[in-house]
Amino acid sequence: MLTVPGLCWLCRMPLALGHWGICSVCSRATRTDKTLCPQCGLPATHSHLPCGRCLQKPPPWQRLVTVADYAPPLSPLIHQLKFSRRSEIASALSRLLLLEVLHARRTTGLQLPDRIVSVPLWQRRHWRRGFNQSDLLCQPLSRWLHCQWDSEAVTRTRATATQHFLSARLRKRNLKNAFRLELPVQGRHMVIVDDVVTTGSTVAEIAQLLLRNGAAAVQVWCLCRTL
């Protein structure tokens, strides 16, 4: 997908503000039309009440905000952000996530955080890629929402196997004790920001770490939730 300055990256129509990257029509069109559980973010009967899965076995976070399923048109943009060094895409994707957060705040009273944290990469992967895509999403979000963010708030303690090829059980084992908290979170409302949440194993491990260290509440914000 080619990004052209001044044109919407999805429909190629002129933009009122060129740096947005995605026009308001396409921004609305990217949102999922499925009813999602407000806690786990998976398809559910009601969008304002936890689903049966969460009532039986709730995840270690209280809310999950997502824009859409991991599918076109967002999936190609996320792929370019991560693997083609297209970091200019991050601001446009961050804006999509911001619009979803503000929508959830208007419709459900979503609480804004005291601090947002990135999902960290292992040092070698960060060095190879040159950036952490989660950091690129957090940077504008923290500025727009006037909340704290530090790219080193959570760090990885070791390399882990690629999650994509592991079962849910092995993903959980793979991530056990893989993260370390570097800043105090006692009594704070925290948000974990990631580009894609699949099984939720990674954000669950970080959420548990935050709660063990005294966080008052944890939310997860992501561009895409695999539905």
From Swiss-Prot:
Family designation? Belongs to the ComF/GntX family.
Q: What happens when the gene is disrupted?
A: Mutants are unable to use DNA as a sole carbon and energy source and show decreased competitive fitness when cocultured with wild-type cells.
Q: What exactly does this protein do?
A: Required for the use of extracellular DNA as a nutrient. Has been suggested to be involved in gluconate metabolism.
- BP terms from Gene Ontology: carbon utilization; DNA catabolic process
Q: Which CDD domains match?
A: PRTases_typeI
Residues spanning the membrane: none
Q: What organism, scientifically named, is this protein from?
A: Escherichia coli (strain K12)
Give the matching Gene3D superfamilies. Answer: 3.40.50.2020
Q: What's the domain of life for this entry?
A: Bacteria
Matching SUPFAM superfamilies? PRTase-like
Matching NCBIfam families: comF, PRK11595.1
Q: Please identify the protein, giving its name as recorded.
A: DNA utilization protein YhgH
